[in-house]
Amino acid sequence: MSAKRTLTWRAGGWVIAGAVLVTLAVLGFALVGPLSGVRPVGDGRDPATYGFDLSGLILPREGLAASGNPRDFLAALDSPAVMPGSDMVQHNAKRRGKYVVTGDRVIGVFIGGVARAYPLRLMNVHEVCNDEIAGVPIAVTYSPLTDSAVVFDRRVGDRVITLGVSGLLYNSNTLYYDRGGEGHVPSLWSQLAFRAIAGPQSGTPLEPIPGVSVSNWGTWLTTHPQTQVVLPAESDERRMKSTSYERYWRDGRVDFPVVRLAPPPAERTTPIGTVSLRTGALFDQVMPPMTFVMAVRRADDWVVVPLPEIVRLCLPPTGFAETSGLGAPITWRAAPDLGAVIVSPPPNPVVIPCRWFAWDAFHPAPDGGSGEPAGAPAAASPTGP
């Protein structure tokens, strides 16, 4: 007779325990609505169940998808607390786990002489932060599936809107909605189309803030020593530890529908092979879909700078790269695989950091152009479903 075997923590019990904890966490989120008497809006599968008027959708319906989560499953972060970035070492020393360290990625914003960092580990669990810097009401938006960061001015006409997470995606990119009181009819706002795509505000643009960077905390702090950093709420701590998209980007697989649009000329991207840098040419090849790029707005079009090219140019002894032909000279300081900080003084152009497949879907070159991502779908008219 064989001896009895006991499952120990080292022998694999940790796997079962981990699975149980994950299951309990999922059940906990699922039961929050029923136990609180609030029914979640959106079934995770059908966009029509999310409570938005889709009848006037101005983009092809094929690119619209439910994320799997209901509306507001990820709660917007409103008017967050901040602290001086120079105090982060002391702040980390007082915590059981460190909040932000040198290699952690952040969204860096510089407005009216004020620098502020929004750690991506925090933005992963909120996807939008309604904030104000130097008197400017802003929405810091981050879409993890497309790794895209856009900071918008929240002033729309005579209103200041406040954004929430809709639970819907377009071209794998987060759709937001404008929150309001009883009787308010919300619109859906696309991060990478820079406008409302459905609802009463359909077609209304949101203006991106210039000079936004995505890089690591160490580089941002070095180039902006007076920066502030946004702090999490206590309820964010556990979710921040368990949320990461690194493996998704490495796999290179896009899990949601993507429709290549056909926007007006001013919203298209000039083929990257025709744009040169001061010390070298941009990649003139088919880029992998998950290549991290910086899209730079010019007067009549956009140009794209791949992060690997900026990194290549940021050689010793200075560690900086200067680019030209992008509407305005830009000086960058890059961190390999993490991003690049804009260090040239204002005014700087609008720069959108994101993954190439997403940018090319929303803002393709007029003829497909150089740099077309592998397996890119055919362009579709944005005139309606």
Residue positions per predicted region:
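Mid-to-C-terminal functional-domain signal that highlights helix-capping/loop sites
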Residues: W9-P385
